[in-house]
């Protein structure tokens, strides 16, 4: 007799998840200040540059990416891991987000999904919105550089990444 044991997810997970907000506001207002009459005074500025995230685990891991519309409209969001050169881009009318709506992409193995959440809390599976070159972006061990955008109004997008640190078992 032979007994086979299959473990599809043989990793221990860190108790604490790491969260990174890619699109952040940076303070621009300082005291003392001077102002020219008729010119606006910048209070803050959105930062759209690349962000670094460290995968402290010993193996590549997926993540949960949340694209949330914080302005009137945005559409066709994408995320690129510049370290691994992987890009996930969403296309089609289902990817248009009105203020308060969000798209959540889970790239963790055995949990792959793309779900749109509407402002009333209802959800819809939009797995069919993957671009033809879509990749389930993974984080390599060590430092990863991520960037994001959207084909329409990327300034209306708030992007949050949540990562589990995977640890090898015995």
Q: Where does each model-flagged region fall?
A:
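Short acidic/polar capping segments at secondary-structure boundaries
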Residues: 8-12, 70-72
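Oligomerization/assembly interface segments of phage tail-like spikes and tubes
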Residues: 1-10, 144
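Short, charged, solvent-exposed linker or helix-capping segments at domain edges/interfaces
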Residues: 13-20
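Intrinsically disordered, low-complexity segments enriched in serine, threonine, and glycine
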Residues: 20-170
């Amino acid at each position: 007799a032979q007994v086979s044991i299959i473990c599809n997810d043989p990793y221990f997970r860190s108790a604490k998840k790491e969260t990174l907000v890619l699109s952040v506001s940076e303070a621009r207002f300082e005291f003392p200040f001077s102002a020219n009459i008729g010119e606006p005074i910048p209070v803050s500025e959105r930062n759209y540059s690349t962000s670094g995230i460290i995968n402290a685990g010993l193996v590549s891991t997926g993540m949960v990416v949340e694209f949330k519309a914080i302005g009137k409209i945005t559409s066709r969001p994408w995320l690129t891991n510049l370290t691994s050169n992987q890009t996930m881009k969403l296309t089609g009318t289902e990817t248009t987000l009105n203020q308060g709506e969000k798209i959540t992409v889970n790239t963790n193995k055995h949990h792959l999904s793309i779900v749109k959440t509407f402002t009333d809390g209802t959800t819809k599976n939009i797995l069919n919105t993957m671009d033809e070159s879509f990749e389930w972006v993974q984080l390599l061990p060590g430092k990863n550089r991520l960037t994001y955008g959207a084909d329409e109004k990327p300034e209306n997008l708030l992007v949050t990444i949540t990562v589990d640190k995977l640890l090898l078992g015995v």
